[in-house]
């Protein structure tokens, strides 16, 4: 399913989910509208009832090219595509005559609390990019704590951006963590800098020069979990993010695609009616996205 003429004033986000964590799309580049965890409720908002809690927005990002921040006003050929067969969502656009950009995000099927965003930049001229991964807490959460660590293994050192917060009544501890995954290794990786804007938002960023014709790719992997699922969500969310980093982008996507190939073995085919076929595929896609074997959640 494709959308080539995106109107922010008439936009309803589509969800990419794995039965546990869901990502709702946004009409703005490098933004996701919401991140939702199944089974995560607390009393807030309208009425004295428990409502779904929005988790940390761990896939928001920004991109600057030659010092100019990318936004919906300075790009062209903006297109969004939902791949229902492999449950991913791709956004692509051009930035003047300087670069073509695309990114694809996944709620990884094999890792119920982990998401991935794979970003690709094709330089049309010599440019300098600054890319940031932004961790932002929804307004409903309280007592937000932000952390930044550099994790050292035998072969590399990599950044870990982490946040925790209490749910509105203090019933739950909510945690999220993410990291960059670079194709460069060791000392060749870009230098990552951490900045804290306020108690609800912090980010990590890097800067890199690209030559005309060069295609540069990197990824953001992150996890989110609460005390409703694990007794020690802070430790668990960092462990899951480190695991995703060590797996690498290719293995993460290959296992995700394989899991969705297995789900689509239960397909329904309608011949001679393309609209009905698309409707059926949409229903099956959302069914498979919102349920998960063994979770008792929907």
Task: Please give the residue ranges for each predicted region.
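Acidic/polar, glycine-enriched structural segments that form the non-catalytic walls/loops
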Residues: 1-16, 20-298
